[in-house]
Amino acid sequence: MIYTLKDGHTPLDVFLPASYWNDELMYYKQVENIVSGGLSKGWFGYNEMHGNIYPFAVWSPAILLPWILWGKIFGWNLVAPVVSSIVFNMVALAIFAGIVKPSVKESVFFLGLLAVFVPYTRYLLCGMPEAIYMALGILFMGLSICYCRKPDRKILIFLFAIVMFATLARPYWGLFFLWVWWFAVRKYNWRGFILGLFAVIATVGIYAWISQTCTAPYLEESVQT
């Protein structure tokens, strides 16, 4: 710390918040390249893999989109992953409070749950994008509560959009299609079913394209030793 201050810098100028994995550096460099040059350059991933067309290794480029947007607007530096994740979650919590309007007791309970959920704080303070999708989860939950109180077509569309985008980034989000699809069918009957089916098919199609062109599987899974 003293050495960096000697040269007029702070530790934040030379330190990338990281956890136990090497993902953080790879994510950071991919976003840096996209923000500055329009496309990730080089070979990335645990085994330096490359997709058929684009160099995103085992990670879907959809994961990086919120950070890319942040980098284009505010710039991209070593602390940008943490700062942006904190801001995204602050915005999500503010929207949640504004649309759900929880009581003081409910607010304390909700914030208490977040406080004791260690992975939430941990991902906020490292270079992993999971905190962004936790923010989407908070927003999704708030919109779901609003829809349960008063079904609205715009809210339903927002819910589908969140699940579609998040599924492209983290496939486990696909489970939430069942929740939103149920909303659609309950309100619009067969039209809701068609809407949900279209959303699922579109997401699967885009994900298949990403998997074939942008990403590559782990090398060790195809090598026998």
Spans of model-derived segments:
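Extracytosolic helix-loop segments that constitute the early lumenal/periplasmic catalytic or substrate-binding loops
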Residues: L5-F15, S19-I53, A62
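Membrane-interface transmembrane helices that cradle and orient dolichyl/undecaprenyl
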Residues: K101-V104, F140-L156, A166
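Membrane-interface alpha helices of multi-pass inner-membrane proteins
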Residues: I155-R170, F177-W182, V200-A202
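Short acidic/glycine- and proline-prone juxtamembrane loop motifs at membrane-interface regions
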Residues: L125-Y133
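Transmembrane-helix signature of polytopic, membrane-embedded enzymes
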Residues: F96-V118, A135
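Perimembrane helix-loop-helix junctions
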Residues: C146-P151, L175-I201
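Loop-to-helix entry region of an early transmembrane alpha helix in multi-pass inner-membrane enzymes
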Residues: G51-A57, P61-I68, I73-V91
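Membrane-lumen/periplasm interface segments of specific transmembrane helices
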Residues: N189-T225
